[in-house]
Amino acid sequence: MKVIHEIEPVWDAGSKVLILGTMPSPASRKAGFFYMHAQNRFWQIMQNLFCEKFQFKNNAPEKELAVRERRNFLLRHNIALWDVLSECSISGASDSTIKEAVPNDFTRIFSGADIKQLFCTGKTAFNLYKKYCSKKYNAPFTYLPSTSPANRARWQDSALVAEYEQIKSFLNESLT
């Protein structure tokens, strides 16, 4: 199925890191925001890293409030968030089925914010960024394991948090 990315990136002039997924899942597209599948561990990891607790769950009936809460969280912590692809053909949420990939244009983010480091959530996001974007945008990029429910057997929660600690460490270093 051909999918066009319709979720706007989250960023502002204070953003220091850019976290990139591949393409929003069907649940995220329905919610209109990133990582909103009830079993995706991205927001749980972010809460753990920054010792914060969200009031609204990913699948809360008050989805607008859940989205606003997460958007404010990202900006408060100098984090930009988007996806590598603007469109592709994909079956469900399976990155392994991606075909006809078209990358997003990150120019407005790199020209409007001082992005020092990119973190790609999952091997597909990392490989697609490397293939389509890395030569155009001069910022280091790092692989992080996927927070997808499909990755649960390979990565326990504590191991994911340990890997994602790189984000917080980088932010702490860049803001001092």
PLM features: residue spans?
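Internal catalytic-core helix/loop-beta-alpha segment
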Residues: 76-124
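Short, hydrophobic/glycine-enriched beta-strand segments
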Residues: 16-22
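Short, surface-exposed acidic-centric catalytic microdomains
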Residues: 28-97
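C-terminal capping/extension of enzyme domains
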Residues: 1-16, 37-38, 92-107, 130-176
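Short, solvent-exposed loop/turn segments at secondary-structure junctions
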Residues: 23-27, 40-41, 86-89, 124-126, ...
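Residue-level signal for well-ordered alpha-helical scaffold segments within enzymatic catalytic domains
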Residues: 44-48, 108, 112, 131
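Short glycine- and Lys/Arg-enriched binding-loop motifs that mark or flank ligand-binding interfaces
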Residues: 17, 28, 118
